């Protein structure tokens, strides 16, 4: 197992006691690997697509903890030999998740998936939780005994800037 995998596994074992921090970490997992999709019947679904077992595990733990979703309500679909899709199809749960992430309001007239809503990462502890979730979903780190390199890969430049700002907030030199 690589050093980066060991670090991710160690970080994923941590479960914040504060719900707001759990939500921030979940928001990072969704921001990095999640999406909203429509079923063939037109119903909304929340989905995380990843080959990362640690991120998959953390996503499920947070779903169960934050939203009290039973594991029997989670749909697992193998997309390829490596990728697994985790979907929530229950419309009440989907609505609850979207509202918690601030991706929609009570009317559901406008749904806007954003990397992270600023209200979710107002507190320092929530910023740390978000960074942890982003690292678990899309980060890597080299063994500091060899050389130091830490990165989190973002799909969009504005997401990378947002994450960079959070890292700089803690005086970490992010580029």
Residue spans of the language-model regions?
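Compact structured core domains
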Residues: 173-175
